[in-house]
Swiss-Prot record:
The keyword DNA damage does not apply. This is Mu-theraphotoxin-Hhn2m. It comes from Cyriopagopus hainanus. Belongs to the neurotoxin 10 (Hwtx-1) family. 15 (Hntx-3) subfamily. InterPro entries: Huwentoxin-1, Huwentoxin_CS1. GO terms for molecular function: ion channel inhibitor activity; sodium channel regulator activity; toxin activity. Monomer. Its main location: secreted. Lethal neurotoxin. Selectively blocks tetrodotoxin-sensitive voltage-gated sodium channels (Nav). Does not affect tetrodotoxin-resistant voltage-gated sodium channels or calcium channels. One of its GO terms (cellular component) is host cell presynaptic membrane. Transmembrane segments: none annotated. Disulfide bonds join 50-65, 57-70, 64-77. The presence of a 'disulfide through disulfide knot' structurally defines this protein as a knottin.
Amino acid sequence: MKASMFLALAGLVLLFVVGYASESEEKEFPIELLSKIFAVDVFKGEERGCKGFGDSCTPGKNECCPNPACSNKHKWCKVYLGK
């Protein structure tokens, strides 16, 4: 009875350690992925020579890329859905 309790406790400790180690690796992965996504997005914006979604703009100057357009109300590039 004591041996089975010891094995169960040892198994739980091992499970906790493995879970904690994998969780710490998973926390670094999304940060790394987001930094790569934003780095690529910034590079594409510089390459195009136009402003992307969420960038400030002046209405009527056509500074935004073809898909996002400059909002007259908010003065930033946004995507218009519909008409």
